Amino acid sequence: MDRFMLPEIIHTEEELDEVLTRPSPALVEFIRTIKSPLLLLGVGGKMGPSLAVRARRAAEEAGYPLEIIAVSRFSDQTLRRRLEAHEIRTIACDLMDSASLRALPEAENIIYLVGLKFGTSQNPAATWAVNTLAPANVCRRFPQGCIAALSSGSIYPLTPVRNGGASENEPLTPLGEYSNACVARERIFEYFSGQNGTPIALMRLFYAVELRYGVLVDIAQKVYTDQPVDLTMGYLNCIWQGDANDLILRSLALARTPPQAYNLTGPGVYSVRELALKFAELMGRRANLIGREADSALLGNPARLSALLGEPAMPLETMMGWIASWIQNEGRLLGKPTHFEVRDGRY
């Protein structure tokens, strides 16, 4: 992000959203290659809104008249109005309903952001349905499309920390219903890619972060409120949400048949202990650390993606400084903890 002046402190959600949606020069260049419309499926989640606006800003900077269509059930009409204010067309659609899908316009370029995680242990059937039936419906509806599909790093088992994170060739043998449903989602995309020749890129995300949610927010909030920070899951990867969205959009260029998978996260393996101690220093608190680091953790090695599209731009230190200030100033949080401490796959 060296071409942008980053603020020392982010005071408001408007300032945060402006930073989150700044496109990289690489995205501005790439966006010119996308044929209209760019179809964004499942924009109602934590990442979708800023991804949509980032795509719009990239097209505007490129001087390129790209039509962007954001698709969601849109139970939140405020979100719908916000996207439309950025000249993003919105369509209400339930991707579990084939008839609703048939009403969507044709598109060659598709970003797939649909998923269901939390509450899996209470309602596993819903998780399996959303994570398998929806991608099957989309692949049947757009057999000639080019799809960048958001997946999850949780499809890997815990791996030895000393190895530096799972590579994309690691066997997919995770624990828990949610993680296995994510494996099934990838297999559905692979199956239809083989059946129809649909080019697909599978983006395995490890912990997107901004100031209102994310693994760094979870740790910082625990430190600030003197809650214990469990060190058992002692190491993690993370990535600034803006960088993740930038790479997801650009990953359309990596779509192939059969699909190729890419770990989507920052380059570092970070110690939870060191993160907690740094937040304690930044916020004038004492970190209440409990437990001891296990030899394994949920980690991914992003070298394959970085070699093709470059490393994420946002430094860890900048994210931590912003988050510490945000929490001290009582900035709004989404109240959606990542549960990064979970080691048995039960979300």
Residue ranges, per PLM feature:
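Conserved Rossmann-fold NAD(P)-dependent oxidoreductase catalytic core, especially the SDR/UDP-sugar
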Residues: 37, 109-112, 117, 133-177
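NAD(P)-dependent short-chain dehydrogenase/reductase
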Residues: 175, 183-237, 241-243, 279
